[in-house]
C-alpha cells in the first residue's frame, strides 16, 4: 500500500460548484500534431467538471482507494508546518499542478525518502528540481500536450487584449463612461504587426497558427528549427538568436520551458533591444523574465504592455508588482486549467498512474526524468546544469 500525496488549489470562494455554466465540452481525441489524447482504462469524472481544486481530487479517490492506497489531498503546501511537509517523508507518489505547484527543491527531495514518482497534472515540471530528482532516482512525468491549446488560446486572447486596449476600455464601460478617446489612445490593430515567439514547440506553434489569419508577419526563435514545409505554410522567419528576433517584433510571446538557458532571458539588456512600444505575453514561466526589469519597462513606456498568467512564486503575494504595474493584462495561472484542459490532463494523470501500478511503461511523451537521467520529452525540452542551483 502506497501513500499518494496530492496538492491541489483551493475550492472556489463560494464553495465547490453544484452546477456549471455549460452542460458539456467538445471531445478532443487527437491533438493537431497527431498525438492521441490520454487513454486511461476508465475515468471517474464527467469532462467539464472542476477537478483541479481540492474537492475535485483529480477524480482519483475511487480508483486509488480501490487499489488499497492511501490518498491525501491538500492545498496547504508552504512551509515546514504545512500538510504537504507533514506527509512528505512517507509519500511514494506526489501529484501537483503547475498552477498551484508543490515545489520539490533539493531539501524537500532529500526528505522524501520514499518518493518514487513526481507527477505533474499538466505541462511543465520546473517546480521539481530535476537534478535532484535524477540524483535520488525519482521518476518525473507530466501530461505533455494535454493543455497546449488551452494555453495558446489564452496567449492569443492576451495579445489582442493588449494591442486593442481591451481591459481599460471594458473598465470604462463598467464605470458608466463613454470615454472613446481614453479607450483608443492606446488601441491599435494587430494587422501588419510583427509577432514573434520564443520557442516553437506545441504551444508556440499553435499560437503562430492562430495568429496567421490576422495577417501579421510571423517570427520565431527555437532550439530545433521547424521543417521547411512548416516555415513556408505559415510564412515564418527563423532567427538564430532571441536578440535578433526581438529587435524586429511588435509582439513577443514566450513559450519555452524554464531551465538554466531561459532563466531571466528577458532582463534589462534584452528588453532594451526591443522596439519602444512592444508588448510581451508570457504564458510560459515567470522567471524567464526579470520581474523588476519588466516593471521598469512598462513604467518608462519602453514596453506598451505586459500580460501573462505565470508568476513567481505561485500563488503570487498580494503585493506582487505585476498585479498593479501600468498596462498589465495579468491573470492568475489559469490558462492551462480551463475546464476543457483539465479534463484531458486529469485523464492523462490517470493513464500515468495506471501504467505505474500495472508495471507498464509510461508513454514516452509523458516522461521527463527516468532511470536517473532526462528522458522522453525531458531529453528534448530541458537542460540541466551540473552546478546550477535553483532557489524558490
Where are these predicted regions, by residue range?
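Rossmann-like dinucleotide/phosphate-binding beta-alpha-beta segment
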Residues: 26, 166, 181-276, 296, ...
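Short glycine-/small-residue-rich Rossmann-like dinucleotide-binding loops
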Residues: 98-99, 123, 250, 256-258, ...
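Residue-level detector of alpha-helix initiation sites
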Residues: 124-127, 142, 146, 202
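Conserved beta-strand positions in the Rossmann-like core of class I SAM-dependent methyltransferases
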Residues: 72, 219, 287
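An N-terminal-biased, well-structured beta-alpha scaffold segment characteristic
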Residues: 2-139, 267, 388-392
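Phosphate-binding beta-alpha-beta segment of Rossmann-like dinucleotide-binding domains, i.e.
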Residues: 136-138, 143-194, 206-209, 213, ...
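Alpha-helix C-terminal capping/helix-to-coil transition sites in glycosyltransferase folds
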Residues: 89-90, 114, 247-248, 273-276, ...
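Rossmann-like dinucleotide-binding domain for NAD(H)/NADP(H)
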Residues: 140, 277-392
Amino acid at each position: 500500500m502506497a501513500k499518494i500525496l496530492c496538492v491541489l488549489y483551493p475550492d472556489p470562494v463560494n464553495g465547490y460548484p453544484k452546477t456549471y455554466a455549460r452542460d458539456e465540452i467538445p471531445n478532443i481525441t487527437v491533438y493537431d500534431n497527431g498525438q492521441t489524447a490520454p487513454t486511461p482504462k476508465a475515468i471517474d469524472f464527467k469532462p467539464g467538471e472542476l477537478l483541479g481544486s481540492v474537492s475535485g481530487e483529480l477524480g482519483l479517490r475511487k480508483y486509488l482507494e480501490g487499489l488499497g492506497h492511501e490518498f491525501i489531498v491538500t492545498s496547504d503546501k508552504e512551509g515546514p508546518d504545512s500538510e504537504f511537509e507533514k506527509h512528505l517523508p512517507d509519500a511514494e507518489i506526489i501529484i501537483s499542478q503547475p498552477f498551484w505547484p508543490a515545489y520539490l527543491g533539493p531539501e524537500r527531495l532529500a526528505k522524501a525518502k520514499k518518493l518514487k514518482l513526481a507527477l505533474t497534472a499538466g505541462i511543465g515540471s520546473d517546480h521539481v528540481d530535476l537534478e535532484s530528482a535524477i540524483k535520488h532516482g525519482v521518476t518525473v512525468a507530466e501530461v505533455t500536450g494535454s493543455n497546449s491549446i488551452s494555453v495558446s488560446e489564452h496567449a492569443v486572447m492576451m495579445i489582442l487584449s493588449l494591442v486593442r486596449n481591451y481591459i481599460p476600455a471594458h473598465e470604462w464601460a463598467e464605470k458608466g463612461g463613454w470615454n472613446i478617446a481614453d479607450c483608443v489612445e492606446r488601441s491599435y490593430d494587430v494587422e501588419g504587426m510583427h509577432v514573434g515567439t520564443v520557442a516553437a514547440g506545441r504551444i508556440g506553434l499553435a499560437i503562430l497558427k492562430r495568429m496567421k489569419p490576422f495577417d501579421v508577419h510571423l517570427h520565431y526563435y527555437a532550439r530545433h528549427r521547424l521543417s521547411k514545409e512548416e516555415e513556408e505554410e505559415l510564412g515564418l522567419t527563423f532567427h538564430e538568436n532571441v536578440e535578433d528576433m526581438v529587435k524586429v517584433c511588435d509582439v513577443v510571446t514566450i513559450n519555452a520551458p524554464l531551465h538554466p538557458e531561459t532563466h531571466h532571458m528577458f532582463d534589462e539588456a534584452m528588453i532594451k533591444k526591443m522596439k519602444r512600444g512592444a508588448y510581451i505575453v508570457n504564458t510560459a514561466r515567470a522567471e524567464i523574465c526579470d520581474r523588476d526589469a519588466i516593471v521598469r519597462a512598462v513604467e518608462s513606456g519602453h514596453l506598451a504592455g505586459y500580460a501573462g498568467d505565470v508568476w513567481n512564486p505561485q500563488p503570487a503575494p498580494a503585493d506582487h508588482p505585476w498585479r498593479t504595474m501600468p498596462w498589465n493584462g495579468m491573470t492568475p495561472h489559469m490558462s492551462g486549467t480551463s475546464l476543457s484542459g483539465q479534463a484531458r490532463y486529469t485523464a492523462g494523470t490517470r493513464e500515468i498512474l495506471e501504467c505505474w501500478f500495472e508495471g507498464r511503461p509510461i508513454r514516452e511523451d509523458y516522461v521527463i526524468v527516468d532511470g536517473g537521467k532526462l528522458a522522453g520529452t525531458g531529453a528534448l525540452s530541458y537542460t540541466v546544469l551540473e552546478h546550477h542551483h535553483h532557489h524558490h
